[in-house]
């Protein structure tokens, strides 16, 4: 199977939401040599890169026990953008933490690229998270004393891995941050900082990027820019993205939206707009 991906133009802002501009001067690129090959979707469904099987998560005991997740079985497609939504206490954040290996289920199994991460010891799980899962957080989590270049490369340096210069240049050009590489976080806008965080997540070519409210601290313009970048990472680089959000406008950028309520997935939606999604959440 070819490892090159056919670039797809960035999709327009979702219907019912503001017209978010794409970053200026961000060209489309094929995936570099050595990038993972992704299976083509079957019957409109992408092959799963992450799977939860009969996953439950309980906190506390007795009358104080909380059932955060209840027997959840769901797969996340390779090369697909999935958004997870739901009210506070619905289980969406717990699901994200468990599928990313940040928390363990009370029962059930979690698979990343076919590996049962619930069976891994702490050392192996830490390595898998470092090598195969990219994280993008609401608070950016950049090191304030390092410039953008050093922040992007930091996880690979800590892992003792050698960065691929061509891949680095490709990501930087695609995200439009080439003129900010020498700047520290305090010298960048929120949108620029989040672009650096996305570049850091992409640098190791992870199996999946997990984004936790990635636009929660951004204004509307920066929100649109970051969502276009995540969308392009899927369309142009074959990246898999799983995002937790409360915002229907950002969720509408996804290929698929899971709606959680009372610890269960109650809706599995495709081809949504911001307006139709808002209506389904009422």
Language-model-detected regions and their locations in the chain:
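ABC family nucleotide-binding domain
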Residues: 47-265
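N-terminal acidic, proline/glycine-rich, low-complexity intrinsically disordered segments
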Residues: 1-11
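Conserved beta-strand-loop-alpha-helix hinge in the C-terminal portion
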Residues: 264-282
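Long, intrinsically disordered low-complexity tandem-repeat segments
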Residues: 19-38
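Primarily ABC-family ATPase nucleotide-binding module
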Residues: 37-49
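Generic cytosolic/nucleocytoplasmic N-terminal low-complexity/intrinsically disordered segments
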Residues: 3, 23, 32, 42, ...
């Amino acid at each position: 199977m070819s490892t090159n991906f056919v670039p797809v133009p960035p999709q327009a802002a979702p219907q019912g939401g503001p017209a978010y501009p794409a970053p200026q001067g961000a060209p489309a690129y094929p995936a570099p040599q050595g990038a993972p090959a992704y299976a083509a979707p079957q019957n409109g469904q992408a092959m799963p890169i992450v799977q939860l099987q009969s996953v439950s998560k309980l906190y506390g005991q007795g009358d104080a026990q909380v059932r955060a997740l209840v027997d959840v079985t769901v797969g996340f497609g390779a090369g697909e953008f999935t958004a997870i939504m739901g009210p506070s206490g619905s289980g969406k954040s717990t699901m994200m933490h468990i599928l990313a290996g940040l928390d363990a289920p009370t029962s059930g199994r979690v698979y990343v690229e076919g590996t049962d991460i619930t069976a891994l010891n702490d050392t192996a799980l830490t390595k898998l998270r470092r090598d195969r899962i990219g994280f993008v957080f609401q608070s950016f989590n950049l090191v304030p004393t390092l410039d953008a270049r050093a922040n992007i490369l930091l996880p690979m340096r800590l892992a003792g891995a050698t960065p691929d210069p061509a891949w680095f240049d490709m990501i930087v050009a695609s995200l439009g941050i080439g003129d900010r590489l020498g700047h520290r976080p305090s010298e960048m806008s929120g949108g620029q900082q989040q672009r650096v965080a996305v570049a850091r997540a992409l640098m190791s070519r992870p199996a999946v990027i997990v984004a936790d409210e990635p636009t929660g601290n951004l204004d509307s313009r920066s929100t649109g820019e970051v969502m276009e970048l995540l969308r392009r990472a899927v369309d142009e680089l074959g990246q898999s993205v799983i995002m937790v959000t409360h915002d229907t406008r950002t969720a509408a950028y996804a290929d698929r939206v899971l709606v959680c309520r009372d610890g269960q997935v109650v809706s599995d939606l495709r081809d949504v707009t911001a307006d139709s999604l808002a209506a389904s959440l009422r």
